Amino acid sequence: MITKPDKNKTRQKRHRRVRNKISGTAECPRLNIFRSNKNIYAQVIDDVAGVTLASASALDKEISGGTKTETAAAVGKLVAERAAEKGIKKVVFDRGGYLYHGRVQALAEAARENGLEF
């Protein structure tokens, strides 16, 4: 019998492979993305200290409704603003094993437009 591969397991495998190559420092932290069916979450992480420096999600009160792509763009803008408050300009983008398309792309472009460099 042919078994269908689990999409989330293959994504996690991709993410582990990428995480072996990418890590964030205090000078250039990692912008990590997690995407669920309804919401999207973004964190700016210093992997050396193991600390989250800034975060934003679709569940934040500042973000209003709209399509999932519009919400992702709003999350990107918000995480860029919160990172700028902490003096963070440069980050390493970690797409979390997701394809750079749709909500992930909208979040990344909004973060770039609002001052994050990656």
Curated annotation (Swiss-Prot):
Gene name of this polypeptide: rplR
Family statement: Belongs to the universal ribosomal protein uL18 family.
Keyword Metal-binding among record annotations: no
Name of the protein described by the UniProt record: Large ribosomal subunit protein uL18
PANTHER family with a match to the protein in the record: 39S RIBOSOMAL PROTEIN L18, MITOCHONDRIAL, LARGE RIBOSOMAL SUBUNIT PROTEIN UL18M
UniProt function note: This is one of the proteins that bind and probably mediate the attachment of the 5S RNA into the large ribosomal subunit, where it forms part of the central protuberance.
Organism whose genome encodes this protein: Enterococcus faecalis (strain ATCC 700802 / V583)
Pfam families, sorted: Ribosomal_L18p (PF00861)
Record keyword Ribonucleoprotein present: yes
GO terms (BP aspect): translation
Assigned keywords, A-Z: Ribonucleoprotein, Ribosomal protein, RNA-binding, rRNA-binding
CDD domains for the chain: Ribosomal_L18_L5e (cd00432)
